[in-house]
């Protein structure tokens, strides 16, 4: 809304300057010292120019302004509508699996209380084994369905890129046809080609968001602060960027013919359908995998930590119940060193739901959380010719010398859901006693584990269920906010669409008796009045 109003006000200010300049020339026709203001292609600069053509330029520039604002708004609508569609899918998944950290975990703790704490059955326990298996199965199913959403986004990006490239090809061909068209011989027929190109540009804008630049005979389509995909008779098609190490990864780039390499340009497509898909993959889907991963390892580690130091009915020391995957380290392909980097969990209770970037500069490691782009200072020490540094419960180990500007990506939860595994085998006794004295066994560890359901395990401030519900609600709130915005912006498109202006087909006769200054004045007054009507209509509809 504010972007549209600001642009409209800027446009009206420019129109006001033109009108003031025209009035000055009318009131002081012999004053040669008046400063000339160049506004909208020097409208009142050349008095010898054909007045009809110049008046048409005023209308064309106004319509271009309206069209640009309409395209901006439409790109936002497509962006938000796409986000809503994807958020609803994610919201459905989170709602479907909301019982994992409530009912299923509660069933497990209740079974411990019933069989171990109260009934004192510190024996082979099929009931507890079944409850744990139910939790693992639910997590695996969550991972399966989350992967489906990730694959769906990847497929959608690839399919939309095919549409984008098809439109780029068509617009490129039409631009060449328009530039080569014999306008003087067939002055009215070129308008049909221009209208056809405009329709294709509208469609392309809804997919990737573009800016049209027209300057005399030049015609360009640019991405947001980026490359030109149409530059007169040149075109630049886009490509999908994938990864051999991560089948879920998808981005957008182009082939630089000079460097003969593929370059990533995801940041140049911040809005529209494609921008929304990329951002949803980059943010919401990544955040979901990280959040669920954080909850899982907090739960699994809390159980492991006491079961591994407990004793079973035979006095044997217990072991971990769950397998917890280690963080994944990805080295940048641009790194100049060949050092080996690995990562492992050191203190899981300190785990954060974020990925990290590690940057090596001037013999220092700079660690950035990607969730909020905050920088943290790791604790660094050298041991056995290895550089070890810790942050947020993770220990990274680097073997070998690093070079300046080396970059590493740390993904703590990329495999957490997939590799979660129940290590306890059927008919294997649980180790819930805190002593190996077979004559005086107890159930102390079971009592401690039973209390974990109400403990603040996540970020030292939330229970597992509280953290899950909070995250799920944040997705719902985001979706609801977008659903409220979209109808308003759709109405804005309608308002702008109805405010285009045209001039009489018989302009020569209609303006024959008006001098050049009067024509410009009347044209600009009409533009200003129309802009005022737009604002009034917005205020009346939404006040």
Swiss-Prot record:
InterPro entries xref list: FlgK, FlgK_D2-like, FlgK_helical
Pfam family, one: flgK_1st_1
Superkingdom to which the source organism belongs: Bacteria
Gene Ontology biological process terms in this record: bacterial-type flagellum assembly
GO CC, one annotated term: bacterial-type flagellum hook
Keyword set, alphabetical order: Bacterial flagellum, Secreted
Compartments, as annotated in UniProt: Secreted; Bacterial flagellum
GO-annotated molecular function: structural molecule activity
Family listed: Belongs to the flagella basal body rod proteins family.
Name of the protein described by the UniProt record: Flagellar hook-associated protein 1
Gene of this entry: flgK
């Amino acid at each position: 809304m504010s972007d549209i109003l600001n642009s409209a006000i800027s446009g009206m200010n420019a129109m006001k300057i033109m009108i003031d300049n025209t009035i000055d020339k009318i009131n002081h026709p012999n004053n040669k010292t008046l400063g000339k203001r160049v506004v909208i292609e020097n409208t009142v600069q050349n008095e010898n120019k054909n007045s009809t053509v110049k008046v048409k330029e005023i209308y064309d520039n106004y319509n271009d302004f309206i069209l640009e604002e309409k395209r901006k708004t439409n790109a936002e609508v497509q962006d938000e509508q796409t986000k809503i569609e994807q958020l609803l899918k994610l919201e459905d998944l989170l709602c479907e699996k909301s019982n994992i950290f409530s009912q299923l975990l509660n069933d497990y703790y209740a079974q411990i209380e019933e069989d171990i704490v109260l009934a004192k059955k510190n024996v082979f326990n099929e009931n507890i084994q079944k409850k744990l298996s139910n939790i693992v199965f639910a997590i695996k199913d969550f991972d399966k369905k989350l992967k489906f959403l990730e694959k769906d986004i990847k497929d959608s990006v690839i399919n939309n890129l095919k549409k984008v490239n098809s439109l780029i090809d068509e617009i490129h061909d039409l631009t060449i046809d328009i530039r080569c068209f014999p306008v003087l011989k067939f002055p009215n027929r070129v308008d049909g080609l221009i209208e056809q190109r405009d329709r294709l540009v509208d469609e392309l804008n809804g997919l990737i968001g573009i800016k049209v630049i027209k300057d005399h005979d030049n015609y360009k389509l640019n991405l947001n602060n980026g490359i030109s995909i149409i530059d007169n008779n040149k075109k630049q098609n886009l490509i999908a960027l994938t990864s051999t190490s991560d089948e879920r990864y998808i981005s957008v780039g182009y082939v630089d013919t000079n460097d003969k390499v593929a370059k990533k340009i995801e940041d140049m497509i911040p809005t529209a359908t494609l921008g929304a898909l990329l951002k949803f993959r980059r943010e919401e889907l990544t955040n979901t995998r990280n959040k669920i991963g954080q909850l899982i390892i907090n739960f699994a580690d809390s159980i492991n930590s006491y079961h591994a130091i407990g004793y079973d009915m035979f006095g044997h020391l217990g072991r971990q119940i769950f397998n917890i995957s280690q963080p994944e380290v990805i080295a940048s392909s641009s790194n100049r060193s060949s050092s080996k980097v690995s990562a492992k969990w050191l203190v899981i209770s300190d785990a954060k739901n974020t990925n990290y970037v590690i940057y090596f500069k001037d013999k220092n490691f700079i660690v950035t959380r990607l969730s909020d782009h905050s920088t943290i200072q790791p604790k660094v020490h050298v041991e056995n010719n290895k550089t070890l540094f810790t942050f947020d419960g993770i220990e990274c180990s680097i073997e070998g010398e690093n070079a300046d500007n080396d970059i590493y990506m740390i993904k703590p939860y990329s495999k957490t859901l997939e590799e979660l595994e129940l290590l306890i085998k059927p008919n294997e006794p649980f180790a819930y006693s805190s002593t190996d004295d077979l004559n005086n066994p107890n159930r102390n560890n079971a009592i401690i584990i039973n209390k974990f359901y109400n403990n603040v395990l996540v970020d030292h401030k939330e229970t597992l269920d509280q953290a899950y519900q909070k995250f799920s609600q944040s997705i719902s709130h985001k979706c609801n906010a977008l659903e409220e915005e979209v109808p308003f912006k759709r109405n804005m498109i309608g308002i702008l669409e109805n405010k285009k202006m045209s001039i009489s087909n018989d302009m020569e006769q209609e303006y024959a008796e008006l001098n050049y200054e009067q024509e410009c004045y009347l044209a600009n007054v009409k533009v200003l009045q129309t802009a005022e009507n737009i604002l009034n209509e917005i205020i009346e509809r939404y006040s």
